[in-house]
């Protein structure tokens, strides 16, 4: 499978931020997101962050992550 584009990742995150998204889709989209960014737990940025990130900010942070 090809890597998702930045725009596709933003779409996924926006969908994940939708409270009406069913659990099956949440799981599917989280799997896709995790496979396409180096950030170890991108779901933390969406669901458990103290910051109120936009989808664009989540993707930027997740893509720019460097394991130190």
Curated annotation (Swiss-Prot):
InterPro entries: Colicin_E_sf (IPR035900)
Gene3D superfamilies tied to this protein: Colicin E immunity protein
Entries under SUPFAM superfamilies matching the protein: Colicin E immunity proteins (SSF47345)
Protein name in UniProt: Uncharacterized protein YezA
Protein species of origin: Bacillus subtilis (strain 168)
Protein's gene: yezA
């Amino acid at each position: 499978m090809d890597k998702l584009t930045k725009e596709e990742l933003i779409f996924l995150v926006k969908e994940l931020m939708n409270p009406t998204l069913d659990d099956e889709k949440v799981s599917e989209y989280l799997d896709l997101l995790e496979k396409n960014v180096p950030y170890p737990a991108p779901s933390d940025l969406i669901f458990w962050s103290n910051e109120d990130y936009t989808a664009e900010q989540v993707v930027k942070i997740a893509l720019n992550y460097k394991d130190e």
